[in-house]
Amino acid sequence: MPRDDDDDARRRLRCNACAAACDALVRDLARERARRGGTLTRALADATMEATCARAGEELGLTMRDGRVTETFAEDDGTARARGRWITVYAREACARLIDGEHDDALMTFGKRDDGGARMEAREALCHARTGTCESASAARAANELEARDRRDREL
């Protein structure tokens, strides 16, 4: 857990959690839309977003590297991840902020396709421009990415 006095680490964790939740929401909306033949009603989109956020706490975790917890969120089963109460809270709160009703239309727009471009656009729009969770558009785009992860891990 970040130290109580480490505001920078908390800010990065919130940004990384937002990006991971945003990626999961875009992916799940695109998959549900594809399953339904390209059409997704608002009610179905809302149910999909609620289900994604309900799973966020269980599926998202902080990656482990050399036996240490990093600031990088992942949901890949092939990646060693740390989980726990505060990690779950970061993931769930990030997802809940994105589906609070204010950003649902944007998520439905980004959720029309599941590719890196849609995810990056959604991160920038939602995690930076709309919520201010990430301090810059570049921070939102770089969140949880390998190059940024390596740089952060060296700094720890």
Language-model-derived ranges and their functions:
Residues R3-L156:
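Extracellular/luminal segments of secreted precursors and ectodomains of membrane proteins
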